[in-house]
Amino acid sequence: MKRPVVITLLVIALVLVCVGIGSVIYFANGFQTNNPFDRNNLALMAEESKTLKVDAEKPVTLNVADDAGDVTVTGGDVETVQVKVVKTAYDSTQARAAEEVKTIKYTIEQNGNAITLKYEIPKSMNFNNNINTVDFIVTVPTETSVSVDTSFGAVAVQGVQGAVDLSNDFGDVAAKNIEGELVIQSNSGEINVEAVDAGDKNVEIKTDFGDITLEQIKAKDVSATSNSGAVTFTNVRASGDAYIKTDFGNTTYENGSAATLTVDTNSGKISITKVNVTKELKTQNDFGDINLTQAMAGSYDLHTNSGGITIDGAKGKLKAYTDFGNIEISNAKSVTLDVKTNSGTIEFSGSLGAGPHKVESEFGNIDLALPTDAKLNVDFKTDFGKIKSSLPITVTLTESSSSEEDQMAGSINGGGEQLTVSTNSGGINITAIK
């Protein structure tokens, strides 16, 4: 009984082997071009070009839709639109790739000064991820508005005067020497923007995954958003609002100005240096330090859940909160203090302006260095620690007990604005600025 079963199984196995061999032979030779099962495709490129006449006295509008390939647009001192096309095909041999490249189709449409370039990927299988591509290299008159929408490939636009709108699913995006409104969106890729003057228009940059770098920007509102990536502003000047948001990545803003500045990150360091903000400077950081150096603002609202806050140079209303971290403020001038840390030390050096002022730490020492001529009404309290002051205090209330609780209330230099300082566990030390 067992022998017929064994013979049957052997026959079935032999049939399957034959079918497998036949399939391999068929798929290897049955596809004349672009064999989807051949993972060793070779590339072949072909170049084509076309010159389009336009009215040089009127602005040009260029629209590019490219499913796969790089797009480069350059403005220049020309009176025509010059289009160079680079087609790239893949197949198992050079001969097959040469045939395949002939099948790549794209379109160039013109309606007056409006030009549209388009390449769509054919709906065919290709398991080795090598898809046919079309690169568009375009030279346009300087006064040209540009719109680019591509799925795979790098995008670069430079030297144009007009609105620029760039969208890319996967690939880096670069814009340089633009005069006009700028909008860039990418799902995955770095974005680099340099030398943009949008006038009273906006600059808006978004990417899901990738770093954002902006340098030498002038606009009304400037915004940069990345779900995962660092954001860097250098010499960015917004007459309106400046907004930066990244979920994961450091934020750096150096040399610039804005009416308002908002920086929001879930995880990363925030560093702002030599930036002038006429109204509010607001930062929110879940995990990371906040560092401000000579960042002048009408008011400050700084908050981090876990990280230190360091400020060198400030003026006006200053609110700084951290759940876990130290707060250090130096070279402050006429500030209104609202400072708190749940766990960490607080160090302040500078002058106080209009009150009331409040400084609080749940666990940590508080050190304040104030001018010798500071006029304040003070209320100092610590549950576990000591209060010391090198500035003379006219005491109206003092309390000390064996439980280590210490409280002192009174006035400095005849009194003035209210300063309240408290810590649950730590000392309070008041010194004079030398």
For each predicted feature, which ranges?
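Acidic (Asp/Glu) and glycine-rich low-complexity loops/linkers
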Residues: M1-T61, D66, D70-T150, Q158-N168, ...
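Gram-negative outer-membrane beta-barrel proteins
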Residues: M125, A156, T213, T232, ...
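Eukaryotic tandem repeat interaction scaffolds
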Residues: S271, K279-D367
